[in-house]
Amino acid sequence: MPQLAPGAGTALDPMVRPCALPLPPAGWGVADALAAFEAARPSLPPGVAAPAGVLGALTTVVLDAGEHVVKVYPPGTDADHLDAIHTVLGGSTSATVSCVPAVPTVRGVVTVSRRVPPGGSPVTWAEVGAALLRFHLENGGRSVPAWAPLSRLPAEVSSLPDEQAEVLLTARDVLLAALSGVRSELGFDTIHGDVSPSNVLRDGRGVTLIDLDWVARAPREYDLASASRRFRSGEMDRATYRSFCRAYGHDVLGWEGLPLMDRVADLAGVVFRIWDCRFHGRDLDWLPDELRLWRTPL
């Protein structure tokens, strides 16, 4: 087990609060992000180049701005929340933080970070484990936002029929209540919140974590749970999973809180699927069967 200083407290008090990172409305996309950049330009450093291409577009739009990356969030994103994370993690050697405060505009919230030069072979899961350990060690004890799991759920179910919405809202409440009793072997402290190889980039001779939107104070095991789910689903073989665990110094499979974290992830997946179907104009004919599973959340 890694020698981590345990976070204060022995139980989690997950927050129910307005969503700081809402999902975008249907129709929002690259054109809005470019318009947001133009509106934000007077507030950005002069060295930030005009976007030359799109690096990614889904719940946010990521633009190639030469030596910088411009990430644009949909309208309604809490710029203060983003700034709180990047200010607290300022100077990090394990993660890439924003260069300037977030700039809210009518078309979206604009952030800028340095561009991590692409190159080299894909990051391995062993490197992810090592990068995550460095991140936890470096950022332990920092005043990051309280964890707010499933914060996107209320907005996404608000237009469902009342009975359907109530099933998912009740499931969320049950899971949040159960989380208050979770005990952690690794401590309650700073987590990355969205661990995957796609959020770890090669940076010179080392690697760096990116996409810090979900940084929060939570059981550190939460950051290990995604790898364990990939292993248990067959997406990751045993040798790869073991390499991740060895690099971090801990295997989460024996943790009593893991089944609950799985259910939180499952419900978050339902919320995302509802949004994705609406965003792309697909129907929700799968939802009634899914709701039957959530009448008994645990």
Question: What label would you give each PLM region?
Answer:
Residues 75, 118, 207, 215-217, ...:
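Activation segment
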